[in-house]
Amino acid sequence: MGTQAWVRSLVLAMLACPTGSGAEQADNPASSDYARPQRLVEVEPGRRLNLYCIGEGSPTVIFDSGLAEPASTWFQVQPRVAKQSRACSYDRAGSGFSDAGTRAGSSAHIVDDLRRLLAKAEIEPPYVLVGHSYGGMNVRLYYYLHPDEVAGMVLVDPSHEDQTEGYRMLSPRGYTRAQWRALGDPGIATRRECVEEASKGFEPGTEAYRRCIFDAPSQMPPVLQRAYLAMQQRPAFHQAQLTEEASVFAASAEQLQAARRSFMNLPVIVLTHAPDTSPLRDWETPALRKARTAMWHNLHAGLADASARGVHRVVADSDHAIQLSQPDAVVAAIIEMVDMARQAR
């Protein structure tokens, strides 16, 4: 594998939901709810976001997904949390059943969209914010900008604004920051090509389909797998994927770096996926994998340490999408957080 592919594998492995491990096609009666629009809320004239709220009670739990991922990635978690408190998931602009975005998919724009959505839907704080991967960056920025609205956070294998610098430091080739950023350009170019191809329509078996359409997570039941694949036929989805991927470690990282501060006494639980035990890739060495794992754990431990009530847990037998591979651990952390938020009143 070439250097560019190596970099892309490192970075994107921590952004999107994998399609592999875990119990497959879990039986969940509520699954079909995620396969169709629920409440389409207008956040600005002519643009709507899909919102799905179930359950009752305060604080309201808000779910934010990984990069360009739909709300359906929480199908094994949200219904169970809703037995304890109100729980709301949503599709970001262009993802799932939401309308296309009108601006870049940076964390600042995502936070602004989410706040508009909650206001229009009359969902009042306090909130327990739950973010997976890129969603972890988004909910952290929400807290930094609006701390009085947040009662607690659960960060599910969250991406981190400093992770690309960590990867650069692990590279044996001594790249400058500018050179390192440039290594991601071919991936962004591919996303642009997918936007163009989506406007024409994808045909299974073609090169464009292979490059642009990803399998649904294997844990999803067939009804959600079909919806996941149908989502990827939409030009709006590929535009969202392009703008979020272009923003996550550029504009979004800068926004987090500028805004970040102590969580003070805010309850925070950080969940980290288990160490990778799969065979080494052709670009990996045992030392590199060990260093990469240590860096990831250290970044997550730092997030927990930013709170006087922070907890960091490594979830056994999990992959990056812990909510799919080990949903029990995520449900338990959220319910624990809801209880802490209620006790703090």
Residue ranges with predicted function:
Residues F63-D64, Y90-R92, V156, M169-Y175, W180-G302, ...:
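Alpha/beta-hydrolase
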Residues Y52, S89-Y134, H146, S171-P172:
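Active-site loop/oxyanion-hole signature of alpha/beta-hydrolase fold enzymes
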Residues A68, R92-G96, G135, H160, ...:
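Alpha/beta-hydrolase active-site loop signature
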Residues E124-L170:
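Conserved hydrolase catalytic core segment
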